[in-house]
Amino acid sequence: MPDYVNWLRHASPYINAHRDCTFVVMLPGDGVEHPNFGNIVHDLVLLHSLGVRLVLVHGSRPQIESRLADRGLTPHYHRGMRITDAATLDCVIDAVGALRLAIEARLSMDIAASPMQGSRLRVASGNLVTARPIGVLEGVDYHHTGEVRRVDRKGISRLLDERSIVLLSPLGYSPTGEIFNLACEDVATRAAIELGADKLLLFGAEPGLLDADGRLVRELRPQQVAPHLQRLGSDYQGELLDAAAEACKGGVARSHIVSYAEDGALLTELFTRGGGGTLVSQEQFEVVREATIEDVGGLLELISPLEEQGILVRRSREVLEREIEQFSVVEREGMIIACAALYPIADSEAGELACLAVNPEYRHGGRGDELLERIESRARQMGLSTLFVLTTRTAHWFRERGFAPSGVERLPAARASLYNYQRNSKIFEKPL
């Protein structure tokens, strides 16, 4: 079977879930200059064709720097923000205007060169962001550098209803006709909050948020952001993370940080369960709970490969339906990714831990330990004093968690009589 068939099958729930949702996408000026920009535009057009309501916010920092250099002007910053005097503002207007036209042209060209040729795509922009001056901070006058005062929610919503892609530039206008240079991260965050967007997608140079060891942080909540911001300091990753957290605090369900340098990063993040970047959300990513009859299909999908390998004892659908109350599961976005069962042993104060399984894609997140802890807690609540486990392949894992080698003679009679000598499982026990 071709890989794309399997991918499409797995992506179909997300295609349905994203339809008619509002996504605000922020692409910095570095991303527009990157060779992968064309692929990003193609992916945005694809999202639009799938029914996603798109607001694209672009940055322009390197383009402004280039204009300043061409005119022999020196850029000035304070606290990481550009000081926009009159001469700099001319460069900002020039750079932003040219960039906006280039993006509109690229969006138009992309659909003409794609399989969706002939379909109508409108890009809309305008005076949709009202701004105010930052003013004087710590004795420094920021001149024409501003901050977002208001986003025209009704105007943008109307354009989205008309199936336009809304393009917002890092410029804002005051009621008195002044123009202000804005941070694209601020524009994107405020737009996402005021529009009640379903997602804020932030492009950066890295795959997402990287920890101190350079490893990708896949998920975190806004409350977990502060230590990372302190570590990152003025690094651009910190700006993206701060924007992502701010959007979530403002009511945006999910913020994502992905790489503009990686082809397909946006689609991977949106249409695969594991994603490819960093997700910031107030939502609970996973839940550990008792299984219900509706979980039988998911359990079969999880344990069948392990049964075929001889790691787990085979259980039919009928057996699972009959014994479903014995199971605890870890659910992630509607998918059962881990399970374990507790079987009290008749005429004894012992129980058996069975069918502990974790989806291969999620085996390094401590989910096995979480389920073991839950099973042990359930066993104590039931008044059991000993927990047995029979295994053929994971003896060391259980020994590392306090289980000691045992034997058939130690099993309660009701369980010993069912022992499969042909399978020859190793027996371990743990006092509770």
From Swiss-Prot:
The family database entries (Gene3D superfamilies) matched by this protein are listed as: 3.40.630.30, Acetylglutamate kinase-like
Enzyme class comes to transferase
- Give one GO molecular function term: L-glutamate N-acetyltransferase activity
Keywords of the record: Acyltransferase, Amino-acid biosynthesis, Arginine biosynthesis, Cytoplasm, Transferase
GO BP annotations listed = L-arginine biosynthetic process
Q: Name one GO cellular component term.
A: cytoplasm
Q: What's its EC?
A: 2.3.1.1
- Tell me yes or no: is Amino-acid biosynthesis among this UniProt entry's keywords: yes
Major location category of this protein: cytoplasm
Task: Name where it's found.
Answer: Cytoplasm
Which InterPro entries does the UniProt entry name for this protein? AceGlu_kinase-like_sf, Acyl_CoA_acyltransferase, Asp/Glu/Uridylate_kinase, GNAT_dom, NAGS_kin, NH2A_AcTrfase
What HAMAP family does its record include? N_acetyl_glu_synth
The entry's family comment says: Belongs to the acetyltransferase family. ArgA subfamily.
- Write down what this protein is called: Amino-acid acetyltransferase
Protein encoded by which gene: argA
